[in-house]
């Protein structure tokens, strides 16, 4: 007989068409993945990157979804997964000398953050 995996409740939030490249957003997401909600907010507040503002907004939305839709306690939430995918690129042109034009690519990305309740000590003992 096979064991059925225990389903954990997850709340997810997306931020679409955020101005900024996906690689620069991933640099920040890699540092907060697996951390608690409170620790992630503190880290995001003091990081010197421009992408921390939209990431904070998406993280707060995911926690609000967990609290409102699933009735979870925000103090027990952990960032289970966070990723950023490339969005459409807006192409613009910058005029240069002698009638030339340099192309400017304005990157966008889609940010997704998933939060779930941290496993408590009693749950860990039951699973073992």
From Swiss-Prot:
Instruction: Identify one Gene Ontology CC term for this UniProt entry.
Output: cytosolic large ribosomal subunit
What InterPro entries does the database record attribute to this sequence?
A: Ribosomal_uL22 (IPR001063), Ribosomal_uL22_bac/chlpt-type (IPR005727), Ribosomal_uL22_bac/org-type (IPR047867), Ribosomal_uL22_CS (IPR018260), Ribosomal_uL22_sf (IPR036394)
Q: Name one GO molecular function term.
A: structural constituent of ribosome
Could you name the domain of life of the organism this protein comes from?
A: Bacteria
Pfam families according to UniProt: Ribosomal_L22
Gene Ontology annotations of biological process type = translation
Q: Which UniProt keywords apply?
A: Ribonucleoprotein, Ribosomal protein, RNA-binding, rRNA-binding
PROSITE patterns, per database record: RIBOSOMAL_L22 (PS00464)
Q: Which family does it belong to?
A: Belongs to the universal ribosomal protein uL22 family.
Record note on quaternary structure? Part of the 50S ribosomal subunit.
Q: Which PANTHER family match?
A: CHLOROPLAST 50S RIBOSOMAL PROTEIN L22-RELATED, LARGE RIBOSOMAL SUBUNIT PROTEIN UL22M
Q: Cite the NCBIfam families for this sequence.
A: rplV_bact
Outline what the protein does. This protein binds specifically to 23S rRNA; its binding is stimulated by other ribosomal proteins, e.g. L4, L17, and L20. It is important during the early stages of 50S assembly. It makes multiple contacts with different domains of the 23S rRNA in the assembled 50S subunit and ribosome.
What is the protein's name according to its record?
A: Large ribosomal subunit protein uL22
């Amino acid at each position: 007989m096979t064991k059925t995996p225990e389903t954990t409740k997850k709340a997810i939030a997306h931020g679409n068409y955020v101005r900024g490249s996906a690689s620069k957003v991933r640099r920040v997401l890699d540092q907060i993945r697996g951390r608690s909600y409170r620790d992630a907010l503190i880290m995001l507040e003091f990081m010197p990157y421009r992408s921390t503002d939209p990431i904070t907004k998406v993280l707060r939305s995911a926690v609000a979804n967990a609290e409102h839709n699933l009735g979870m306690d925000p103090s027990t939430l952990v960032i289970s997964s966070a990723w950023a995918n490339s969005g459409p690129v807006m192409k613009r042109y910058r005029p240069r000398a002698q009638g030339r034009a340099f192309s400017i690519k304005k990157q966008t990305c889609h940010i997704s953050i998933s939060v779930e309740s941290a496993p408590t000590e009693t749950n860990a003992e039951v699973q073992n």
